[in-house]
Amino acid sequence: MAKKQKKLDEISKKFGDERQKALDNALKNIEKDFGKGAIMRLGERAEQKVQVMSSGSLALDIALGAGGYPKGRIIEIYGPESSGKTTVALHAVAQAQKEGGIAAFIDAEHALDPSYAAALGVNIDELLLSQPDSGEQGLEIAGKLIDSGAVDLVVVDSVAALVPRAEIDGDIGDSHVGLQARMMSQAMRKLSASINKTKTIAIFINQLREKVGVMFGNPETTPGGRALKFYASVRLDVRGNTQIKGTGDEKDTNVGKETKIKVVKNKVAPPFKEAFVEIMYGEGISKTGELIKIATDLDIIKKAGAWYSYNDEKIGQGSENAKKYLADHPEVFGEIDRQVRVRYGLIDGDDMAEAVGNKAESPVETLEEVTLDLDDAIEIEE
């Protein structure tokens, strides 16, 4: 019995060695034909954690779970008219430029306001802008930019405005059933691999439509077919809520609106989280406002009555004064922002602990400067 088992083990080992040899040869041939990295074992990848770029909003970074938009993925931002979709995308553009990247904006709606973009922090002198004549042209331009590998972020505004060339050349009233959906489906098939390879973030802004005759369920849908829904790693639903009134002389004036951003699809973190931000007219997302709210909830900023304090120091009476304090003290803003991100696990706490430790008493004492004359120096040398 033992001899039979030993023989079976030898056969299995020999057969296993032959299989491994055949697999190694196959891997070598694949790399020879298609290049190094065409196939690999998943454990061999140096970077298994998804790389992200901040969305430009702390609340949205937290809702996304990974700390921002995943690189090399497709993002869809949709919602009703004037809900803040383009504002959310422009904050991503400003963040990409802030991190030293290059951003491109495909303005299919021909409605980009350069002044508003600049107010949100976008460097309009460095922003690549295209206003295509047709949907095919816009997607082709986006594809060439992505294939170059030199662009970090591409925004398409919007999918609904990507009109197929056949529809433009035809007459109003002509039927073009499924034309835009087929165009988007082909574009997604071509772009998805290139987007992942070049680690470019592609943001597609989309509008809302309503299905006819829907009695039960949500009648809302997005134009462009289902391809974008499938290929998108993240889908954001942007909805404007209540209006924000001003203070003082502007107490009866609408100065902004509270906006809810819901992550309805997320392939890199748990979905269905929500972010509530204040979009101020002419300014964009109030970063100081969202930081105060989140830091107060985490008890990083203390609130007693109407007063806000940080590290036992009062920073303002009322939220508006606290916002002004943080805007005037960017170092305090950055310190609180880092603490919030560490608490939510968006960044590693080791770097922050090291920075805080450096502020504490140093273990190395500072030596006083001692002046020696030449005779003392010779005596020490001897």
From Swiss-Prot:
Q: Cellular location of this protein?
A: Cytoplasm
GO terms for cellular component: cytosol
Does DNA repair show up as a keyword for this record?
yes
Source domain of life is Bacteria
Keywords carried by this UniProt record: ATP-binding, Cytoplasm, DNA damage, DNA recombination, DNA repair, DNA-binding, Nucleotide-binding, SOS response
Listed under GO biological process in this entry are: DNA recombination; DNA repair; SOS response
Protein's UniProt keywords contain Disulfide bond: no
Q: What does the entry list as the binding residues for ATP? A: G79, P80, E81, S82, S83, G84, K85, T86
Predominant location of this chain?
cytoplasm
Gene3D superfamilies the UniProt entry points to: P-loop containing nucleotide triphosphate hydrolases (3.40.50.300)
One GO term in the molecular function aspect is:
single-stranded DNA binding
The family assignment reads: Belongs to the RecA family.
- Role summary: Can catalyze the hydrolysis of ATP in the presence of single-stranded DNA, the ATP-dependent uptake of single-stranded DNA by duplex DNA, and the ATP-dependent hybridization of homologous single-stranded DNAs. It interacts with LexA causing its activation and leading to its autocatalytic cleavage.
What is the name of this protein?
Protein RecA
* Record organism: Streptococcus sanguinis (strain SK36)
